[in-house]
A protein has these predicted regions:
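Pyridoxal 5′-phosphate
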Residues: 1-204
Length: 204
């Protein structure tokens, strides 16, 4: 795809410069046009009582199949769309893993999680996490360890391996961003996946 064509189709007021692409992309005219086209027949996906419902259901199922194909997922994988961005996806994951607890419930139970944290799951986060991928864990039923930066500005792999080795007998969840939205430095996901498999950890 031509970068100049991409720039021409970005929705942004003239004279404004945007530097947060890793976190949130801007509106893009071809995508917005496609959304407008789909909205012409938009309806509930859990209904089969109208042609519009069938059309929207097909959009949804085709999108799911496309994601699974692109990520090379097998039939034993499930996709759980949240519809409200990555922050909602993190919360959904925490609910499934038994980590998320509503603040009012936490206050009502009055449990001192610090006193039992070693019996809770260990969540490993990276040095360049968005707040939604760190603060929400710190308020949940888990212990959180943050891996520091290496000299090259990326993930400190030696420290990660050390933490994994020390906690090998615990339930471990690795929730590390694929890239820093400040520097743009990418995490080596193949190395991260290999480290997780070595110690039986789950990647969020």
């Amino acid at each position: 795809m031509n970068i100049d064509k991409i720039r021409q189709n970005i929705i942004l007021k003239d004279g404004i410069y945007y530097f947060d692409w890793t976190a949130s992309g801007l509106g893009y005219i071809p995508i917005e046009d496609e959304i407008r086209r789909m909205l012409q027949t938009y309806a509930n996906t859990h209904s089969e009582c109208s042609e519009c419902s069938n059309i929207t259901t097909n959009y949804y199922e085709n999108a799911r199949a496309g994601i699974k194909r692109l990520l090379k997922l097998q039939s034993d994988f499930l996709l759980l769309p949240c519809g409200q961005g990555s922050s909602a996806a993190i919360k959904k994951f925490q609910e499934i893993m038994g980590i998320y607890i509503p603040p009012a419930t936490k206050m009502a139970l009055n449990i001192d999680f610090d006193s039992i944290k070693k019996s809770l799951p260990l969540v490993i986060v990276g040095p360049y996490e968005h707040h939604s991928n760190e603060i929400s864990y710190r308020t949940g039923m888990c212990e959180v360890v943050r891996i520091p930066l290496a000299r090259d500005g990326g993930l400190h792999w030696g420290e990660l391996d050390k933490i994994l080795k020390i906690n090998a007998n615990r339930k471990i969840i690795i929730s590390i961003s694929a890239a820093s939205n400040v520097t743009g430095i990418k995490t080596n996901l193949a190395m991260l996946n290999a480290a997780a498999k070595r110690y039986g950890a789950i990647i969020a």
